[in-house]
Amino acid sequence: MSDTLYAAYNSDDNYAPYLGASMLSLLQSNTSFSRICIYIMDCGMTEESRCNLQHIAAQFGREIFFVPMQQHIAQLDLHLGAHKMAVAAYARLFLTQVLPEDCSRVLYIDCDTIVKGSLAEIWKLPFGNALIAGVQDTVDNYFLSAIGLEKGLPYINAGILLVNLEAWRKENLLAQFLGVIRRFDGNVPAHDQGTINAVCGARRIVLPVRYNLTSNLYSFSAKTIRRIYFLDSYYSQNDLDAAIADPAIVHFTTGLLGRPWEEGSTHPERQVFLDALAATPWGALPLQPDSRYFGLKCFTFFYEHCPRGLFEFLYRNLCWMLHLRK
């Protein structure tokens, strides 16, 4: 296995500062690699943002490449309604066209993350027949059935993905992704994440949860997650406790804790993110308004003020009404 780490991000200009914080943390935490090449799928960044990211890479003597994605995304016949943020996320479907042909694997990382540990162990992971490796997500079985997958199969969070590029090229997964998007008339359940899960099917490796510690895992126990999301299986409580104590990648997903760059966030790793952001050229960026939708803010209030059993009852039944009755 090569000692070169290939990492990929995608972003528009709105998320460029948070990409910068994540990238800085990646480089700080992975000095053991002899070479790190970072590919930025550019969905509309300014020249100033690109220069800022180049400055961060240069601080660590690492390589960075920018790939304009507008023409690629234009191939997608998307009908997303109000979900405009999902458009840039679809860029990860084009990884085979972004990375060089001699690159057999890549670690895709969402911008809203902080890397706190070495990635050397998972980078050397043998794929076998698998197309992706990732962490099981906290979503209910509706999303599996909605994209035609067997109930009980671990649904992978696409925010952190180790991608078998060699197999993606050989089996032309891009064409399969586009086929799924057409099948759902441009509105796949869970967007790009649903598309990737639908195509990869059972050919996935489930990584330890410490490699993608999403916000829900700070709010709920393993038992509660299985109950409120109607999951047949999930990580154990010991798995969650160990990951929270020593995370490799913290993923600041939308949730009850808010996001660290927004006002009112109570995320336990909030200051770690803000410290990383402060060390980038965007260090003076003020906190942004809380962007969570009204319903999620209401659930946050109930979470903080209601008995836990009542909250779980409300949350579970909301999931049932939104998904399982469809």
Please report, for each region that a protein language model flagged, where it lies by residue.
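Hydrophobic targeting segments
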Residues: 6-9, 26, 37-40
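Histidine-anchored nucleotide/phosphate-binding helix
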Residues: 16-31
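A glycosyltransferase accessory/donor-loop signature
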Residues: 1-11, 170, 174-326
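Short loop->beta transition adjacent to catalytic acidic/histidine clusters or analogous donor-positioning motifs
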Residues: 30-39, 64
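Short internal beta-strands
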Residues: 36-44, 134-135
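GT-A fold catalytic core of metal-dependent nucleotide-sugar glycosyltransferases
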Residues: 66, 70-72, 88-140, 153-155, ...
